[in-house]
Amino acid sequence: MSFTMREMLEAGVHFGHQTRFWNPKMAPYIFGHRNKIHIINLEKTVPLFNEATKYARQLAGKRGTILFVGTKRQARDVVAMEAARAGMPFVETRWLGGMLTNFKTVKGSLKKLKEMQAQVEAGTQPAIKKEALMFQREIAKLEKDIGGIQDMNALPDALFVIDVGFHKIAIAEAKKLGIPVIGVVDTNHSPVGIDYVIPGNDDSAKAVALYARVMADAIIEGKANSLNEVVEAAAGASDEFVEVSDPA
């Protein structure tokens, strides 16, 4: 486990929303309230977070892809950074409708982005002022909208979503396609439809950073375990090889 209860407390994971905004479906995960703010029961959060990271670790070990989604201001930078560290795709600016359900069209845009990036690398982009300006605007827009998924050649195997209420469209698309969702769920949202619920504060920058770091660590560990198994299997196969010399 790469996190502790103390870290969660320091990050404010246990602070929910004002009691008047609560979603009754989150009742099983609420400890109580203080100053009209719901307090999330971290004794429930810890095992659920462990279950979510175990799933992510196993999926990464099978070369699965987990798409990180966090477009809220306090989540953008850390989501992009931790997803990149784990070698996973991410959406940090805005979710484009149809990003999953209309992935065929998205793949066309990804192909165009790569072609334009190749032009920049080769120095063959338009040189005429007006055309150059249009080229720069288009590539900047594509990089902003889909830059985080430019290496995602197929639909992801799972979504990791910070703030399920803020990303309802992304979750709806995933559910429609049968893609599992790991989601941070605060007291003002519903955990229904989320395959791996992480009850916790989705507004605190420290809490968001903790979720993203722990998830990235789990993925990296899963990849490393998979690689070690391959190396050990190869070593075992070489040990079994016995050279037989020809009789004199």
Curated annotation (Swiss-Prot):
Record InterPro entries: Ribosomal_uS2 (IPR001865), Ribosomal_uS2_bac/mit/plastid (IPR005706), Ribosomal_uS2_CS (IPR018130), Ribosomal_uS2_flav_dom_sf (IPR023591)
Gene3D superfamilies in the record: Glucose-6-phosphate isomerase like protein, domain 1, Helix hairpin bin
Keywords: Ribonucleoprotein, Ribosomal protein
Keyword Ribonucleoprotein assigned: yes
Annotated family: Belongs to the universal ribosomal protein uS2 family.
UniProt cross-references to NCBIfam families, sorted A to Z: rpsB_bact
Name by which UniProt lists this protein: Small ribosomal subunit protein uS2
Organism: Leptothrix cholodnii (strain ATCC 51168 / LMG 8142 / SP-6)
Upper lineage: Bacteria, Pseudomonadati, Pseudomonadota, Betaproteobacteria, Burkholderiales
Gene field: rpsB
